[in-house]
Amino acid sequence: MGSGDLLRSVESICSSYVSEGERRAVMVFGPRALGYGSPDDELYVLLVADKLGTGVRVVRERAPEARLSLIIAGRGALEGDVKDGLLGELLADKFLLPYVAVEGHSYLADIERRLKKRLARELLMDIASSFPRIATEMLIDPRYFLYEVASRMGRLMPAAAYAFANLLAHPRSRRKNERRMLEGFLRALRELEGEGLVVREGAFYKPTPLLVKKASRPSILGLLWRVRGAARSISRYALRALYGLGAPYMSERRAFMERFAHLADVNPLSVLPKPEDFLFLRTDIGLRPALKEVALEELAASLELTRGPDDVDMVEIGGTVNLVYLVTVRGAVGLARFIVKYFKDWKNLTWLSLRLWALGAKKFAVSGKERLRREYVMCRELGSLGFPVPRIFHVNLRAGYLVEEFIEGVNFADMLRRFFLGEEEARPVVELAEEAGRLLAGIHGAGISVGDFKPENLIAREDGHLSLVDLEQATRNKDKAWDVAEFLYYAGHYVPSISTAEEFELMARAFLRGYLDAGGSPDVVRKAPSARFVRVFSIFTPPQVIEIVNELCEGGGP
């Protein structure tokens, strides 16, 4: 901003239109006011008048130091635009950018806070409605609100994007202006925290269950938001005809072309940070963007597993309800393997799932988003408690997949098949079965039910111990007896129908012994052979296995 003489000229010109006693506030804005415009640029002035109601007028004046474009807005017009987009936010959006307060400093700061609180709330509701099942796990850098607003405004009215680009495109300018532009958002977030809609975690904010609940109200609310957004867009273009209100945008565009001539043909939004760069989830390798793709070769290098040029192989390894890939990254030095799992909605349930639902024995999570959330949350939670589960390296909520650690080893189900056929020694199988029981008891002791604790989801690692994979059905405080029943009956269906099932009994005793010795509840064991579970598995589990399970579990354990 220029000299004190210029500010005095501004006040004098304002007084010729609205007396000092009727002025609520005066501010200057735009390229000339903020120091990146040319000396020939107009100086833009916003005067807020108490007695003008919802009226708006634009006049041009000349001061000795500069040409002025004076926007005189009634207090009702400005506050209506801030609250409801009354004028397509053609007045309100001036408070998204730095400005110079001439009069009414506290009023202008309050207007900025109110606008940014409303926008932050709307964006938070949008996140919560888009990702309701995992929103409470997301960490939001406050810069997300700044750049998401810039992005949305720039898409509705492309000329508006130049103002943000002028202030934020160059790293040096960004360091100076970003902090100033965030102040109002930070004040707004503190208020939203006081209302219970977000919680602060370090430098980040997390949505709360209350926010998710508010965002899940009848879908007509979302429709109204979209209609209001469309109306704002229409009103922006209609109101450009109002003399002078479109001029500041054209000045910003000219300033951008003069300052960044080499970017003249570039969309100004492309020179700004992407909003999705500021939405995170915690993983076992730190914070990772929640909505972005990941280059697995870069991930392997960051984990220091590979070095040098990479070759990437992707092989589908099954999954009846998900797309699951084993990805191998071979560097000039080193090799890394990852599991990439895409979570689809269960539009066609497997026969077993249908049977479970029909008999009321078990309700599975069907939504792909819900199953991704459970896999992410439970791997993180159980891993933090020391349980042997895969580490999560990356999550992409938009594409519905996660990248997790590949556990090297032998599937325990394969070992059981060979054992029941007499092709595997008893000792390692019995020891691992007992370890499986201890593992399940520990997880139950943490208040978690696995939901899919079948032998296929246990991997015998090279060190001789087990890891548990596929936690997409895990949840808190559900039917723990189902976990015991599924392990035993599912393992039993590998037993040949003509077998005496002695090997199965040996394995089952070891599993139950491990479960009870590690603190598992006898009541849980006693409920495992209940009729509702037996009905589910009786179609493929030999009767001699069912009889053994009944005998071992009826008294609460062998």
Q: What is each of the regions a protein language model found here?
A:
Residues G2-R8, V58-M153, S233-H262:
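Conserved NTP/Mg2+-binding pocket subregion across the NTase superfamily
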Residues E11-G55:
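Active-site nucleotide-donor binding segment shared across nucleotidyl transfer reactions
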Residues Y249, A255-E316:
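Juxta-kinase regulatory segment immediately upstream of eukaryotic protein kinase catalytic domains
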Residues L323-R371:
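ATP-binding glycine-rich loop module of kinase domains
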Residues W351, G368-R371, P390-L432:
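Conserved structural core of kinase catalytic domains
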Residues G445-P455:
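Catalytic-loop of the protein kinase fold
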Residues E456-Y489, H493:
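Catalytic activation segment of kinase domains across protein kinase-like and atypical kinase folds
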Residues D483-D517, F540:
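Active-site activation/catalytic loop segments of kinase-like enzymes and analogous catalytic loops
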